[in-house]
Amino acid sequence: MNQTLLSKFGKPIERIKNAILALKSGQGVIILDDEERENEGDLVFACENMTVEQMALSIRYGSGIVCLCITESKRKQLNLPMMVKKNTSAYRTGFTVTIEASKGISTGVSAKDRLTTIKTAIADDAKPSDLNRPGHVFPLRAHKGGVLSRPGHTEAAIEIVSLAGFKPAGVICELTNKDGTMARTPEIIKFSENKKMQVLTIQDLIFYIKNINHL
């Protein structure tokens, strides 16, 4: 990871603390993974206070694949089967079947509809019948060991929103360039400056959890 580009956001601990403050104030953050992994940046929002405008931003500037990061216990609560029995994807991303709110939406595609689906899914009393399958939101089941076991965006999103005091449920969407290619660190930094968003890395989170959060 290019630490020179990231230095304007502070050192690793500062980046985590700034991200926590941003999420608490209702903003989103951007999480980068390792250059040797996916080498991508994801927009990340806490499900509980995400707005329609933020969902629209994710759809417009992201890949369009809006994912809901959830725990295994939430997956079981909603009775969501994994998308495939044998996961052969490169990083074993934990896709479940896609979902749609069974009430309160139209086609399920709009920013408002996708956010309604997410708010429905994360409700404490959510039931399997509250969701239709398939749909336009992609739930991702996080590894139970978090980023220490799987250093992916799914786990990182749940870690950072939990550190900010929210339910362990986050929305992620990969940032892309105007030409449809994946945004890399220089483009991601430029985007973050334009949108005034905090940037952190999965390695920052791992360092924080090992050295600060577990003291």
UniProtKB/Swiss-Prot annotation:
Pathway: Cofactor biosynthesis; riboflavin biosynthesis; 2-hydroxy-3-oxobutyl phosphate from D-ribulose 5-phosphate: step 1/1. Binds 2 divalent metal cations per subunit. Magnesium or manganese. GO terms for cellular component: cytosol. Mg(2+) 1 binds at E38. Its EC number is 4.1.99.12. The keyword Nucleus does not apply. Its cofactor is Mg(2+); Mn(2+). It catalyses: D-ribulose 5-phosphate = (2S)-2-hydroxy-3-oxobutyl phosphate + formate + H(+). It is an enzyme of class 4 (lyase). It comes from the Bacteria. InterPro entries: DHBP_synth_RibB-like_a/b_dom, DHBP_synthase_RibB. Transmembrane segments: none annotated. GO terms for biological process: riboflavin biosynthetic process. The record marks H136, E174 as: Essential for catalytic activity. HAMAP family: RibB. Belongs to the DHBP synthase family. Catalyzes the conversion of D-ribulose 5-phosphate to formate and 3,4-dihydroxy-2-butanone 4-phosphate. This is 3,4-dihydroxy-2-butanone 4-phosphate synthase. It comes from Buchnera aphidicola subsp. Acyrthosiphon pisum (strain APS) (Acyrthosiphon pisum symbiotic bacterium).
